[in-house]
Amino acid sequence: MAILLAFGLVAIYSSTVHQSGTSYVTRQAVWIAVGMAAMVGASRIRTKTLEAFAPLIYAVAVLLLAIVLVAGTGPHGAKRWFNLGFMSLQPSELAKIATVLFLARYLSGRKEIGESIRSVLTVFAIVGLPAFLVLYEPDMGTALVIAFIAIPMLYAAGLDPLYLAFLVSPLLAVIAAGEIVAWIIFTAFLIAVMVLAKFRTSLVALIFGVNFLVGSLAPRIWMGLEPYQRERIQAFLNPEAYSHGAGFQTIQAKIAVGSGGLIGKGLLQGTQKALGLVPEQHTDFIFSVIGEEMGFLASAAVLAVLAYVILKLFDVAKQARDRFTTYICFGFASMVLIQTVVNVGMNLGMTPVTGLTLPFLSYGGSSVIMLLGSMGIILSAYSTRKGY
């Protein structure tokens, strides 16, 4: 983690020094120090204590998400942060941790999920409430992270992979709903798989009903997105058509990464960065700064270290002494994995621009403090893996 944090500070300095001097990198260094303190503090909290307070933490996070919609601030009319003067507090970062803790507590109290419709619906409610509030800010990227965290946690809880596939089928329903032939094929395939798998009639009805409802509402869902969100999705599908609009940042980020070559142009020498062609260089597109100025080798090294950290987090989950600890480790590891894949993907034009930051590297006080705090919880889990 120290290597990633150091890389992040260097990239933040390089991407902001010409416009703002050392103010950004100084603030990030302070937030990292606070995050380290949070990590040490969290590592001393027993997981049993976290399990007991998980409902309260979740309730506080949901309450803050509701309040920020009324009293929050943010760019372009969004309401994502509380302005505290010396920093901006982003409740959605706490919501990610709170959702993992509360969902882990719920799953650990169930012997098995199996085909229990009630259990699956409860999981949907646990992740759906904070995800909906975050989406309303609007912050589609973080909302998707909160929602998708449930998938690996349910897998760890023993839910059949086939059932997990059906949990994400509504997303396919939204896509298929745009064309009648695709919708017919999707519906027929969905029903055929459920019949061949010998699902209970009630479960077949539930899955079909949810997909039919979501598919029917697809036009409303699309129009319910903010204009810039629709443009980002359209730009992802056809970036050249939006080269002077929503697709501009993706195209410029790809150019920056590709122009770095093997060893990069050198620190502070990035032309795409210096000309301001890549927006949000110190947050969403910090990977493009690393690619342009430090090259492929440094980019590959960053990804390798991130992969190592993620694998170690999953390894801690396997060594955990109880189910609750296993689930929280799976949840936090998945959180880092999802954000890494999406952020790097949007820097390479492989995923839509969602505003998700790159874990450990991007600028952001709330994100780095909460992230390091979650790592402290995993350290607590690791220290008690043998029951002491």
Question: Where are each of the predicted segments found?
Answer:
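A juxtamembrane structural motif centered on a specific transmembrane helix
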Residues: N343-Y388
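Hydrophobic alpha-helical transmembrane segments of multi-pass inner membrane proteins, especially
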Residues: A2-S14, H18-G245, G291-L348, G373-I377
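Pore-lining and gate-forming transmembrane alpha-helices of multi-pass membrane transport proteins
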Residues: S288, S299, F330-G331, P359, ...
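Short capping/connector residues at structural and topological boundaries
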Residues: V17, M87-L89, L94, L267-L268, ...
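TM-adjacent membrane-interface loops and short helices in multi-pass inner/ER membrane proteins
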Residues: A235-T283, M294-A298
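Hydrophobic alpha-helical transmembrane segments
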Residues: E112-I113, T250-G258, I369-I378
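Transmembrane helix boundary and interhelical junction motifs in multipass membrane proteins
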Residues: D139-L144, K265-G270, Q281-T283, L348, ...
